[in-house]
UniProtKB/Swiss-Prot annotation:
Keyword entries, A-Z: Oxidoreductase, Pyridoxal phosphate
GO terms under cellular component: cytosol; glycine cleavage complex
Protein name, UniProt field: Probable glycine dehydrogenase (decarboxylating) subunit 2
EC numbers: 1.4.4.2
Keyword Transferase: no
Record lineage: Bacteria, Pseudomonadati, Pseudomonadota, Gammaproteobacteria, Legionellales
Catalytic activity line of the entry: N(6)-[(R)-lipoyl]-L-lysyl-[glycine-cleavage complex H protein] + glycine + H(+) = N(6)-[(R)-S(8)-aminomethyldihydrolipoyl]-L-lysyl-[glycine-cleavage complex H protein] + CO2
Family according to the record: Belongs to the GcvP family. C-terminal subunit subfamily.
Cofactor or coenzyme needed: pyridoxal 5'-phosphate
Described purpose of this protein according to its UniProt entry: The glycine cleavage system catalyzes the degradation of glycine. The P protein binds the alpha-amino group of glycine through its pyridoxal phosphate cofactor; CO(2) is released and the remaining methylamine moiety is then transferred to the lipoamide cofactor of the H protein.
GO biological process, one term: glycine decarboxylation via glycine cleavage system
Pfam families: GcvP2_C, GDC-P
N6-(pyridoxal phosphate)lysine: residues bearing it: K264
Amino acid sequence: MLIFEKSRKNRRTLAHAIADKMDANDIPANLLRHDAPRLPELSELEVVRHFTRLSRQNFSIDTHFYPLGSCTMKYNPRAANRLASLPGYLKRHPLSPAPQSQAFLQCLYELQTMLTEITGMEKISLTSMAGAQGEFAGVAMIKAYHESRGDYDRTEMIVPDAAHGTNPASAAMCGFTVKEISTTKDGDIDLEKLRQMAGAKTAGIMLTNPSTLGVFERQISEVAKIIHNAGGLLYYDGANLNAILGKYRPGDMGFDVMHLNLHKTFATPHGGGGPGAGPVAAGPRLSKFLPVPMVGKNKEGYDWLTEKECPKSIGRLSAFMGNSGVLLRAYIYLRLLGKEGLSRVAEFSTLNANYLMKRLEQLGFTLAFPNRRASHEFIITLKPLTRAYGVTALDIAKRLLDYGFHAPTIYFPLLVPECLLIEPTETESKQTLDHFIEAMEKILTEIKTTPDLLRNAPHQQLINRLDEVKAARELDLRWYPIAKETEIFIQ
């Protein structure tokens, strides 16, 4: 039930009582409303109960196993939230002078240092407000590099068929023509086709390694050689960095620029469209093009580096200096784990993924790449079950909700039919994984005996299935309802 449907005329809260005591004569006439605002009228208790009830309907990392592939839904340590909320950080104004912000700047400077070491890059900018914005910045840096050399004919960006959708979008936004490169049946880039594609028009290639197929690109050194010999650059999408922390570094693989997703790899909160952070790191070729501001260190302490100190920078991406609360949480996470802890993140994320993959294979599910070891996530294809029983990946995803699990990513990557992309992350226990396996075993039995149970799932949620096509095509979003029967409170 909507909160508007609970509204009753003249029902008040303490806030209403306070507002009633205000003298409208103290407010200029041109600022006064002529009509009552379209706000629901409820008691404070009713409001509290309404939103508490809604909160109990949420799936979150704090309440459920969340194996959403390519999203790294790991636990966000509460210590990071607590320390990042200390008054000295919360009360600091974004435009506070550097001499009054030395502790804050020191944290950001040390975060820059740690992230450059983790990635094998030369320099990093923390200012990007999200992974997608960081990705756009990295591609813009590639464009700036070629243009600074007078190489305006490099208009093509190579993107694998298994890439995240943001990759071709970022390339197109920067004015590049996207050239899709295919993947082999074992999940690697097709080198022969890459050799044919790379040439004088190639600006670069955008890769995730491990890829969204859940396997490591084994020929990355040869890929880097082909692109660099053609005069192009390598962009690293940091979406799957969690799998290689402390083991492999993108800079050592030959990548020239990359972005990091702090909400994935470094345990800052997901959700709601922000706030986020997507730092951009670059090697020697591109570091001078990094967006500003960055934090520098001199004999007086720490200070902001702006366009004055970085004249080749692509400029600013946002107001102020990035989302400081998110950056502080990532800094605290890194300090809590240290080098050894980060290596264990990679080890346990890979261990959990491979354990889950093998157990599901033993149950009878079909792996998309049965001859490959999973990196941190893996894909099962339900095509044989769809063909035999008419049950789809969507049906299984909906049925998992009844068993208390968030569904994995479905139908992505697009080149694997009827797929589930499953990523357990390093923070889940073997017991949790075993419970998920038990649920998948029961679902497999249901597919073979009572497939209609899945076709009509979920059965234990307040909402069954939405018309997703209609919802996408006929957008009707507003903060208040338009039905007359729900507008009684404003009459």
